[in-house]
Amino acid sequence: MAVARAFAVDPDLLLMDEPYGQLDVKLRYYLEDELVRLWKALKSTVIFITHNVEEAVYVAERILILSNKPTTIKAEVKVDLPRPRSVIDPNFVAIRKQVTDLIRWW
């Protein structure tokens, strides 16, 4: 509901910090699709903070990997995949692995 309220005011920028952390998997998948649909319709910039790599690859156009030093960006990964995305697509899996490897090796 909070996501719907946030988009209702048609923001230029929306910051979402772990918005799906306490949701079950089925609801999370549904809301990820809704977020992408709203983002495309409203053309707002969304900064989506998550520790879930699969979630990041699913919703993002680009992923910023932060280093262990505060406010330092270690890497940027472009996610140039068509929508709707499939978590079993080989390109999706490759990007997920790339992000995971960047996180693993600070």
Residues covered by each model-derived region:
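Conserved catalytic motifs of ABC-family nucleotide-binding domains
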Residues: D10
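Conserved beta-strand-loop-alpha-helix hinge in the C-terminal portion
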Residues: K69-R96
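Helical segment within the ABC ATPase nucleotide-binding domain
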Residues: R28-L42
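Conserved H-loop
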Residues: S44-I49
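Short coil-to-helix N-cap segments within the nucleotide-binding domains
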Residues: Q22-L23, L27
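Catalytic Walker B motif of ABC-type/P-loop ATPase nucleotide-binding domains
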Residues: L14-D17
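Conserved catalytic segment of ABC-fold P-loop ATPases
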Residues: Y58-I65
